[in-house]
Regions:
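Catalytic core of membrane glycerolipid acyltransferases/transacylases, capturing the structured
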Residues: 38-66, 74-75, 90-144
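Structural alpha-helical scaffold elements that stabilize or flank donor/cofactor-binding regions
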Residues: 88-89, 133-134, 155, 186
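Short gly/ser/thr-rich secondary-structure transition/capping motifs
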Residues: 75-83, 142-146, 206-209
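Hydrophobic beta-strand scaffold residues
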Residues: 79-80, 141, 162, 194
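Non-catalytic C-terminal accessory region of glycerolipid acyltransferases
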Residues: 2-10, 20, 24, 146-258
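A generic structural signal for alpha->beta connector loops
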Residues: 77-79, 115, 136, 159, ...
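Membrane-anchoring hydrophobic helices of lipid-metabolizing enzymes
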Residues: 2-94
């Protein structure tokens, strides 16, 4: 005779801690990988010329993030479909703007765009997990609005890409938070196009207010879509209004409920 299957409640009690541990180990691996690279970046920063340091720094950050997504994919706990971003990989002078549902949004976009820079809080420049690598990659600090715009324009003129989340923080109100104008100002000053990117998910995981220790429904699914390409603007306020309306109409939340 075969033994009866364990009741659903018992299976959940057994499975839940394993799933929680697996997810935490993946996040821990991302952090440890970042810490290890930042130790190397700290040594390379004073030795490498600016252009070479920028290229190596960005490529290594993208590589580390791709490793995270590869492991997450094998675990089948987090499923990411971001292949469409590969079409942008080699473009020069491009601003990529996206909605911001999760703490992992920059990780999923930068993993596919090794020439891209992000704008980071000035305080993060001294974070041991992020600071040395970000400085080597010449990520852009937001010490001041004027300095941030000037550095971003210079980076774009040198062939870089810029990843921005115009909501400024993770989404807290449906469909999107009000957009900040920085991306539009930079696009006008640099006269570069703006590529809209949608991140679709039904999962609340690592959204605003979601604690790291809390296990969400699994699997967690993220799908990245390419949206419209906006031409270099003459009027940054008009571009801001147009892009915000476009995202408000195009964001898909709850599309992957199962």
């Amino acid at each position: 005779m075969t033994e009866p299957a364990a009741p659903p409640t018992a299976r959940r009690l057994f499975w839940w801690p394993l799933a929680w541990l697996g997810l935490q180990l993946q996040l821990m691996g991302l952090g440890l990988n970042s810490l290890a690279w930042n130790g190397v970046a700290l040594l390379l920063y004073p030795l490498l010329p600016r252009a070479l340091g920028r290229r190596i720094g960005r490529a290594m950050i993208a590589y580390g993030y791709r490793m995270f997504w590869t492991i997450a994919g094998y675990s089948r706990m987090i499923r990411l479909d971001a292949d469409v971003l590969d079409a942008l990989r080699d473009e020069e002078g491009l601003i990529v703007v996206a909605n911001h549902p999760s703490m992992l949004d920059a990780v999923m976009i930068v993993a596919r765009l090794p020439r891209a820079a992000c704008i980071m809080k000035a305080s993060l420049a001294y974070n041991p997990f992020l600071g040395p690598g970000a400085r080597l990659a010449r990520y852009i600090r937001n010490d001041s609005a004027y300095g941030m715009v000037q550095c971003a324009v210079r980076d774009l003129e040198e062939g870089g890409q810029l990843v921005l989340f115009p909501e400024g923080t993770r989404t807290t109100q449906a469909p999107i938070n009000p957009f900040h104008a920085s991306f539009a100002i930079i696009a006008k000053r640099a006269q570069v196009p703006v590529q809209a990117v949608f991140i679709d998910t039904a999962s609340p995981y690592l959204g605003k207010g979601w604690p790291l220790w809390r296990l969400p429904p699994l699997p967690i699914r993220f799908t990245v879509r390419l949206g419209r390409r906006f031409a270099p603007p003459e009027d940054h306020q008009a571009l801001l209004a147009e892009v915000q309306a476009y995202f408000a109409a195009g964001v898909q939340r709850g599309a992957y409920d199962s």
